[in-house]
Regions:
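C-terminal regions of RecA-like/P-loop NTPase motor modules
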Residues: 1-10, 24, 37-47, 58-146
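Walker B catalytic acidic pair
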Residues: 14
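Signature of the SF2 helicase/ATPase Hel1-core->accessory helical subdomain module
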Residues: 17, 55-58
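Conserved ATPase-coupling elements of RecA-like P-loop NTPase cores
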Residues: 19-26
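Non-membrane alpha-helical structural segments and their capping/turn regions in soluble enzymes
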Residues: 26-33
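P-loop NTPase catalytic core of nucleic-acid-dependent motor ATPases
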Residues: 51
Length: 146
């Protein structure tokens, strides 16, 4: 696709359904690290930005009945995801509030973002897209240029 179509961005979704048939290890941690290294080498060689969608293992509900917020360590092969990734984003739904949070879990290069920064979105069925979720508090705050 890089040579035929000239793609510059690739989304692998979901990661666990795309197998590495040349894998040399049955150990999930070693497999994950080797696979991520192959993806990184591909990205550098062809100058392609790759988003890897990796779902967490089973998440449990907290005492208040909400599903706990996962981290990169909740993905199968946990520590390798954090160690091998330059950046990590969390997309987490709050089904009660009907919002979706996007949170920065890891930023290797600090000029590209801030660890822990988050934004909230609401699904807009008419447009078929997510729109920024604005609370009354946020609406009252002036923008930096105001």
């Amino acid at each position: 696709l890089v040579k035929r179509k000239g793609i510059k961005c690739l989304v692998l979704d979901p990661f666990n359904k795309i197998r590495d048939i040349d894998a040399k290890s049955d150990d999930v941690n070693r497999y994950t690290m080797d696979y991520l290294a192959k993806i990184e080498a591909f990205c550098k060689k062809y100058d392609v930005l790759t988003f890897i969608v990796a779902h967490p293992t089973k998440m449990y509900k907290t005492n208040d009945g909400k599903i706990e917020e996962p981290t990169m360590y909740n993905i199968k092969g946990g520590g390798e995801w954090y160690d091998a990734s330059y950046h990590g984003l969390l997309v987490h739904r709050d089904y009660d509030a009907k919002t979706t949070k996007v949170k920065v879990l890891k930023v290797k290069f600090q000029n590209l973002g801030e660890n822990g920064a988050e934004s909230h979105f609401t699904w807009e069925p008419r447009s078929g897209s997510f729109v920024p979720h604005v609370t009354d508090e946020a609406a009252a705050e002036p923008m930096p240029w105001e």
